[in-house]
Amino acid sequence: MTTWITICDTCKRDGWDQGDMALTDGERLATLIEAEAEGAVKTRRVSCLMGCARGCNVAIQSEGKLAYTLGDFAPEQEAAEGIVGYAKLHAESATGQVPYREWPQAIKGHFITRHPPLPSGK
């Protein structure tokens, strides 16, 4: 199954309006994640994951596996590397669960929710 990183491209962190405002913080993080993920996992952008109080937000998902929402990321390379690194581990896991000791440091403390897979069949 394909693992996807869904990236909120409308996220704006506190102080966003103090910068050049050419791009949202979500757009900046999305660009970094997309470059880091190329050829490893799939990415897509959506407008609003409704986690505005904890932006920048991403979701890591795959059919039949646990799904995770992560947030409170700065739009920086270290965050993108950690998110993609975790998504690769998620892809390798049969259930989507990754042992804590394997988590990239950059994603620790950023988990918001975990969703069980949807039931299959009827």
PLM regions and their residue ranges:
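Immediate flanking context of iron-sulfur cluster ligation sites
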Residues: 1-6, 30-51
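Generic detector of well-ordered alpha-helical segments enriched in charged/polar residues
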Residues: 30, 34, 81-88, 108-109
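Short flanking/linker segments adjacent to small metal-binding domains or redox-active Cys/His motifs
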Residues: 54, 59-65, 86-122
